[in-house]
Amino acid sequence: MATRAVARRKSAAGETSGSATSVRANGGELADRDLVGMYLDEIARTPLLDAAKEVELSQTIEAGVFARQVLEGYEETGADATREELQALIDESERAKDVFIRSNLRLVVAVARRYPRSGLPLLDLIQEGNAGLVRAVEKFDYRKGFKFSTYATWWIRQAITRSIADQSRTIRLPVHLVEELGRIRRVQREFNREHGREPEPAEIAAELGSTPERVTDVLDWARDPVSLNMSVDDEGETQFGDLLEDTSAVSPEQSVLTLLRSEELDDLIGRLDPRTASIIKMRYGIDDGRERTLTEVGKEHGLTRERIRQIEKHALLELKKLARDTGFEAAA
């Protein structure tokens, strides 16, 4: 849903990116650090939200979404509220969304800083992460009792890692191939919008007056050869291969750590042994909203990264089993 709040956020992010590009040409990495410092000073002026305020803002946003739906079908629904009243709810919703976003911009910076070797400037990662934050605010369901910071981290990380995966080409194509690739991409987008699926090479070729073999060749040439073992995070734990989409992965709402209401999750984790419970809480930021790396958790418990990974995997399976046995999963 396109909103004025989103537009303002994208506009602000674009201005930051444009300024960064200009200054980088003259000051390089030092200028980037200066811009990040200025940005942090600016966003630090907005206070953080407590859980009650998050719920209040979410309710206001939800009311605005409903009001927009009513307003769009105003003549058919015969709504009791006037157009002016509905528009007032929409405007208030946009203001609430803007406050929600601004109050969590520091979370985006914290996540973006985990990828210093991604090949992208920190400001660019922050800009992509901000888009993920906007998505999180729009999708957040306060009724499930989750901490917003934990929920939003998933969306922020998704936006950033996808940006890393789409980073600048390592192989430069000739201009005529770039133009041909652009035409192919345009047909792909239009076909997908019209038919709801990706076109086959033969369907693209028919539209462009080309051959399926030529379309396949151009798409193959356009692929970037990137090492799957390339490290992209500060601790060296995340490799490029880890960023590739898992088509079998569940959405954040379906995850075992977000499906359950917070009080039920606390109850389930309390059934694990103390060490395992502590590891799960640290890994997923359940107590303070800050997710720890395998290395950090390992140091805290005097265990290796691999051992922490094994304990975490076993614990998640145990939590799923407990959720089924207790009926929490069905109630979520």
From Swiss-Prot:
PROSITE patterns: SIGMA70_1, SIGMA70_2
GO BP terms in the entry: DNA-templated transcription initiation
UniProtKB keywords: DNA-binding, Sigma factor, Transcription, Transcription regulation
Record function comment: Sigma factors are initiation factors that promote the attachment of RNA polymerase to specific initiation sites and are then released.
Binding partners and assembly: Interacts transiently with the RNA polymerase catalytic core.
Homology family: Belongs to the sigma-70 factor family.
Name under which the protein is recorded: RNA polymerase principal sigma factor HrdD
Biological classification of the source: Bacteria, Bacillati, Actinomycetota, Actinomycetes, Kitasatosporales
